[in-house]
């Protein structure tokens, strides 16, 4: 019993009596890689193409969007509950992190515009659709007001660009 608890706590499946491993009943209990992490990591490493590819591959309807320790992961109520000093520190962190994220989103927009200019509306649509899905995710109720505003702006930009593409 103790071995089962210890191995389950490490994220390793236990195999009672050597039988097949059953999948966990609740996948949300496992720590998931934040959706934005692969794209943001590539961006920070200077890999623009990899960052855009990671952004396009992301499932923006999944969670968590950002790492738990990121200011971007705070809801508005969590942000307001911080002490004045912590709120100021998180505000600075939030502004910096949003700046990086907006640069990545601009690169995705640019990739879509370049695809459209080269006569590849399918790739352009993929870029703008990912941008719109990201915007919708950021604009959700689990985000801070500032992150929601950025999400709304991304969705609006995506709609504008999608409207320019041939049907």
Give the residues covered by each predicted segment.
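Aromatic-rich surface patch/π-platform used for binding flat ligands and interfaces
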Residues: 15-167
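C-terminal motif of bacterial Sec signal peptides marking the signal peptidase cleavage site
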Residues: 6-9
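Sec-dependent N-terminal signal peptides
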Residues: 1-2
């Amino acid at each position: 019993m103790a071995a089962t608890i210890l191995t389950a706590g490490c994220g390793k499946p236990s195999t009672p009596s050597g039988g097949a491993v059953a999948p966990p009943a609740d996948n949300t209990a496992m720590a998931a890689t934040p959706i934005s992490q692969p794209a943001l990591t590539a961006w920070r490493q200077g890999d623009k193409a990899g960052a855009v590819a990671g952004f396009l591959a992301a499932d923006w309807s999944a969670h968590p969007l950002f790492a738990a320790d990121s200011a971007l992961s705070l809801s508005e109520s969590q942000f307001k509950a911080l002490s004045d000093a912590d709120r100021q520190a998180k505000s600075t962190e939030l502004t910096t992190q949003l700046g990086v994220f907006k640069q990545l989103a601009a690169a995705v927009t640019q990739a879509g515009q370049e695809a459209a200019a080269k006569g590849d509306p399918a790739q352009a649509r993929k870029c703008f659709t990912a941008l719109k899905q990201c915007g919708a995710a950021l604009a959700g109720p689990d985000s801070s007001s500032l992150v929601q505003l950025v999400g709304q702006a991304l969705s609006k930009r995506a709609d504008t660009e999608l409207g320019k593409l041939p049907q």
